Curated annotation (Swiss-Prot):
It comes from Bos taurus (Bovine). GO terms for molecular function: betaine-homocysteine S-methyltransferase activity; zinc ion binding. It is found in: Cytoplasm, Cytosol; Nucleus. Keywords: Cytoplasm, Metal-binding, Methyltransferase, Nucleus, Phosphoprotein, Transferase, Zinc. Zn(2+) binds at C217, C299, C300. Its EC number is 2.1.1.5. The modification Phosphoserine is found at S330. Involved in the regulation of homocysteine metabolism. Converts betaine and homocysteine to dimethylglycine and methionine, respectively. This reaction is also required for the irreversible oxidation of choline. It holds the Pfam family S-methyl_trans. Its cofactor is Zn(2+). Homotetramer. It catalyses: L-homocysteine + glycine betaine = N,N-dimethylglycine + L-methionine. This is Betaine--homocysteine S-methyltransferase 1.
Length: 407
């Protein structure tokens, strides 16, 4: 089973990766906590770190028990400009500093219960979408960075960027701390929203100072690994080296467009039929490892049992199973204890590996048509505002949606 925490100094993220160790990330906090009633869909901001620290702490612990050895601070969308965007007054009522500090404290507490590191994370900003300057956008990142340095996180992650330009600015801002920086973009094989290829994105991120590059969110494991492969090829062609990282969705998205699952009509409240099984994730973990990815985790939709699947699949390489495997038989082997004989007959790898999963929805399509509005930085509808969205603005969007649906 997984090694317990101790008083010894932990190896850093680059020391671990350079030695060939497999790093297992955590899963999707905002989706998991929204379902549990602690995060509001829409703004997706992390004030739960202050308002409900016990919920955030418990989710960290479940990921740790499942095999994660990185506790990523719950600071997704915790920039000051996001916390006061479109009627979200968290910055005014609580303050961005308190949210970021609380998230760091919780992550450190849980990380020290095991052999885990703490990663401070920043993500894309309303300031960039509103065409603010490089200096202004970097200042937003620097506000969070000040907290991460004060709380002495082990390394930093710039994640969930749709535009490589902003991701580069984030990496440059974070690199000033002297701590290792990882950078992941929420892009598919077509590249970022300005059509910069995945290979070129990776090159720019490494040149900006990132030691670890890859993708997170927006796309399923299969598509995400296709993108990581393109990043790897781009780095090799440029003669650059970096560790590879993958933290995809736990939803199947073969029908999504360039912006990924946020274009799907089911986003965010109808995605459950698309959830990946634990066996899907074991397959993803093996394919990621074979591609050369050594930082393997998940994003939205990834629950602790998905992370456990990664840890179990890669247990031979890591040398141990996670603590959560104490209550989980490999490939369903624990089903041999079931009272019903047909269930006991499912206690084998061959059954679950080859099962074609039914949705139970006989009149529903298996694929959707993405909305594909095609908006990006500078588009009027993406210009952000401090005030809440008005009724008139909503009516205009409703009419546009009707028009798009009729096309």
């Amino acid at each position: 089973m997984a090694p317990a925490g101790g008083k010894n100094v932990k190896k850093g993220i680059l020391e671990r990766l350079n030695s060939g160790e497999v790093i297992i990330g955590d899963g999707g906090f905002v989706f998991a906590l929204e379902k549990r009633g602690y995060v509001k869909a829409g703004p997706w901001t992390p004030e739960a770190a202050v308002e409900h620290p016990e919920a955030v702490r418990q989710l960290h612990r479940e990921f740790l028990r499942a095999g994660s050895n990185v506790m990523q601070t719950f600071t997704f969308y915790a920039s000051e400009d996001k916390l006061e965007n479109r009627g979200n007054y968290v910055a005014e009522k609580i303050s961005g500093q308190k949210v970021n500090e609380a998230a760091c404290d919780i992550a450190r507490q849980v990380a020290d219960e095991g052999d885990a590191l703490v990663a401070g994370g920043v993500s894309q900003t309303p300031s960039y979408l509103s065409c603010k300057s490089e200096t202004e956008v970097k200042k937003v990142f620097q506000q969070q960075l000040e907290v991460f340095v004060k709380k002495n996180v082990d390394f930093l992650i710039a994640e969930y960027f749709e535009h490589v330009e902003e991701a580069v600015w984030a990496v440059e801002a974070l690199k000033a701390s002297g701590k290792p920086v990882a950078a992941t973009m929420c892009i598919g094989p077509e590249g970022d929203l300005h059509s910069v290829t995945p290979g070129e994105c990776a090159v720019r991120l490494v040149k900006a100072g990132a030691s670890i590059v890859g993708v997170n969110c927006h796309f399923d494991p299969t598509i995400s690994l296709q993108t990581v492969k393109l990043m790897k090829e781009g780095l090799e062609a440029a003669g650059l080296k970096a560790h590879l990282m993958s933290q995809p969705l736990a939803y199947h998205t073969p029908d999504c467009g360039k912006q990924g699952f946020i274009d799907l009509p089911e986003f965010p409240f109808g995605l459950e039929p698309r959830v990946a099984t634990r066996w899907d994730i074991q397959k993803y973990a093996r394919e990621a490892y074979n591609l050369g990815v050594r930082y393997i985790g998940g994003c939205c939709g990834f629950e602790p049992y998905h992370i456990r699947a990664i840890a179990e699949e890669l247990a031979p390489e890591r040398g141990f199973l996670p603590l959560a495997s104490e209550k989980h038989g490999s490939w369903g082997s624990g089903l041999d204890m079931h009272t019903k004989p047909w269930i006991r007959a499912r206690a084998r790898k061959e059954y679950w590996e080859n099962l074609q999963i039914a949705s139970g929805r006989p009149y529903n399509p298996s694929m959707s048509k993405p909305d594909a509005w095609g908006v990006t930085k500078g588009t009027a509808e993406l210009m952000q505002q401090k005030e809440a969205t008005t009724e008139q603005q909503l009516r205009e969007l409703f009419e546009k949606q009707k028009f798009k649906s009729a096309q």
